[in-house]
């Protein structure tokens, strides 16, 4: 917890979140159990520190910032960029905060995660044990990475999909894995891959060679 975020200030932010949109300083003071004078002082400090939005009006509702959500464990700090080529000095102060992991990944309603088993998609950085973000869709465009159900498999598979006449070709991103072809009516598309969450140690990637 940041040193300036004392237990009292943390309680104020948590109470503001609990009370929701429209929460006033008076309501938060009552929720936390402090005086109106004390809440006024703490609110001013929290605004200066960037944990509460600036006041639109003197008695307007309190609004927590993304920085506050991150400090309360509801978001992740973004510490700038890191170089993959020439070494760069790591930044010590966060330049921004993401309000949640959903916002960081750009998730939409209905999106879900699947854990990957196997190494057929390592060429695009999807490793065994990683998670892929899937956006439900009954169809995908040629070349998109899709989650599909195929004949003889009880589980869905992750492959790059192409249409060829009445057939569907499913290709891996690993030259050691064979391509698969099925009649289009036997393939059921569950959705398209829109993101990846890597959770394992770095490994060697493979790329498809034509």
From Swiss-Prot:
Keywords, sorted A to Z: Autocatalytic cleavage, DNA damage, DNA repair, DNA replication, DNA-binding, Hydrolase, Repressor, SOS response, Transcription, Transcription regulation
Residues forming coiled coils: none
Gene3D superfamilies for the chain: Umud Fragment, subunit A, Winged helix-like DNA-binding domain superfamily/Winged helix DNA-binding domain
Residues of the DNA-binding region: 25-44
One GO CC annotation: protein-DNA complex
Site positions per UniProt: Cleavage: 84-85
Location of the active site: 120, 159
Gene Ontology BP annotations: DNA repair; DNA replication; negative regulation of DNA-templated transcription; SOS response
Catalytic activity field: Hydrolysis of Ala-|-Gly bond in repressor LexA
GO molecular function, one term: serine-type endopeptidase activity
Uppermost EC category: hydrolase
Database matches in InterPro entries: ArsR-like_HTH (IPR011991), LexA (IPR006200), LexA-like (IPR039418), LexA/Signal_pep-like_sf (IPR036286), LexA_repressor (IPR050077), Peptidase_S24_LexA (IPR006197), Peptidase_S24_S26A/B/C (IPR015927), WH-like_DNA-bd_sf (IPR036388)
Known EC number: 3.4.21.88
Family per record: Belongs to the peptidase S24 family.
Function: Represses a number of genes involved in the response to DNA damage (SOS response), including recA and lexA. In the presence of single-stranded DNA, RecA interacts with LexA causing an autocatalytic cleavage which disrupts the DNA-binding part of LexA, leading to derepression of the SOS regulon and eventually DNA repair.
Quaternary structure annotation from Swiss-Prot or TrEMBL: Homodimer.
PANTHER family reported in the protein's UniProt record: LEXA REPRESSOR, LEXA REPRESSOR-RELATED
Protein name as catalogued: LexA repressor
Native source organism of the sequence: Deinococcus radiodurans (strain ATCC 13939 / DSM 20539 / JCM 16871 / CCUG 27074 / LMG 4051 / NBRC 15346 / NCIMB 9279 / VKM B-1422 / R1)
Source species taxonomy: Bacteria, Thermotogati, Deinococcota, Deinococci, Deinococcales
